[in-house]
Design a protein with these regions (language model features):
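Selective transmembrane helix interface/packing segments
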Residues: 1-232
Length: 232
């Protein structure tokens, strides 16, 4: 007789990084719902306090970064970059909670890379037109077609593997410190967590989001035209 797999069996059979991804996604969704409820009651004439100040700082900073790289069309790209930044930073620092960082799994980072790659291609096709976009692969000479294709296809792997390697290395080093030093790790662990989880996690989030914005910017036409508005 076949044994019916329960949700508990399914969940425990998942890898630690996938379990962390599920847990953090649920937590972020709950936090977003709570913040959304708070924002519904917030009036723009009110003096910002608490989480509102943090949100204004975060969204304002990402908007400024996107605007400096992309220009006028930044308004439709910034929400994706903001969502990406929040998930990446929370995932990168999840080691502070004793979790396996989701970004220490190549499946997670490559998925993020493929998502970004899809948006990059959609942006190029939407802004340039399908024929003009495809023509770009044979410029300045058709002989460059293989090189251009390889460079384009390498984008999600470049983004995903860079993030994966940096976060995994930090997790491995922290694991070695705890296994070798035992209780003595409590002396050096705070400083190492500060570097590998917080500092390195922030830097990798910044690098991923900056590269994402730059790749998207590279698909936009040179003219200073907000093509998102003209195509709505």
């Amino acid at each position: 007789m076949m044994k019916v797999m329960t949700f508990r069996d399914f969940y425990t059979n998942l890898s630690p990084s996938i379990r962390s991804t599920i847990f953090l996604t649920i937590v972020l969704l709950i936090v977003i719902i709570i913040i959304s409820k708070k924002l519904d009651k917030y009036k723009y004439t009110d003096t910002p306090t608490g989480i509102i100040i943090i949100l204004e700082w975060l969204i304002g900073g990402i908007n400024d970064m996107c605007k400096s790289i992309i220009g006028r069309p930044y308004r439709k790209i910034a929400p994706y970059v903001t969502t990406l930044a929040i998930f990446l930073f929370v995932a990168n620092i999840s080691g502070l909670l004793g979790l396996t960082p989701p970004t220490a799994s190549v499946s997670c980072t490559l998925t993020l890379g493929i998502m970004t790659f899809t948006i990059i291609q959609m942006t190029g096709i939407r802004s340039q037109g399908i024929l003009s976009y495809l023509k770009g692969f044979v410029d300045p000479n058709p002989i460059f077609l293989p090189i251009n294709l390889i460079g384009e296809i390498a984008t999600p792997f470049s983004l995903g593997l860079r993030l994966f390697g940096n976060i995994l290395s930090g997790s491995v080093i922290m694991g070695l410190v705890y296994s070798v030093m035992g209780f003595g790790a409590i002396v050096v662990a705070p400083a190492l967590h500060g570097y590998f989880d917080i500092f390195s996690g922030f830097i990798q989030t910044l690098v991923f989001c900056t590269l994402t914005t730059m790749f998207i910017s590279g698909k936009l036409p040179d003219e200073e035209v907000d093509y998102f508005d003209t195509h709505e």
